[in-house]
Amino acid sequence: MTQRIIIIGGGPAGYEAALVAAQHGADVTIVDSDGIGGNCVLYDCVPSKTFIATTGVRTDMRRAEEMGVQAHFDPTAYRLGQVNGRVKSLARAQSADIRAQLQREGVRLLSGRARVHNSQPGMATHSVEVTFENGQKKVLDADVVLVATGSSPRELPDARPDGERILTWRQLYDLTELPKHLVVVGSGVTGAEFVSAFTEMGVKVTMVSSRDRVLPHEDADAA
């Protein structure tokens, strides 16, 4: 009997599980509201690495003179809008590649928000209610429901993101001009990446952290 599997969330955990399940003959459906690939592909891991690769060009140019190559780089030459446009374009391309791979494996993709549906209050069932973008709802039955909703940026009560002066790591790629001074709250991997990248671009950067060192979850020597 074919197993019916519904996966809530289309990030790395969700789409990898979907691919494996489909390859083993399961009937798989992914319900996702933010885009296949999730935060990792669309807003975090892939975009940040692309962004860092851009700043790495300046790093190479600074070292060029040591190798006998005359090179001059004007920090104002950065076209941040163009840089971020490339970042977003590559992220969308990878998301599209993952979507195509899922569809080739026969995975059904639904765009909407999902929640576990209980036809009788207090009685857990293997049903999921999907609310589509147009407001319509549909209840799907499953043998297995996998919740893989991932993470979202933490918002501080007294510093709500407004997309202009206070930004989450999702909104940072909407900037079109380099800031004169960037304050990064958090010393984890994402925070450290942005500190490194914007410093290399000539921006004054201040890191604020509640921990006693950068990269608190990594090896102490590396941090």
Where are the regions that the model predicts?
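Glycine-rich flavin
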Residues: 2, 19-26, 31-178, 211-215, ...
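N-terminal Rossmann-like FAD-binding beta1-loop-alpha1 element of flavoenzymes
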Residues: 3-30, 191-199
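Conserved N-terminal Rossmann-fold NAD(P)-binding element of oxidoreductases
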Residues: 8-9, 31, 147, 185-186
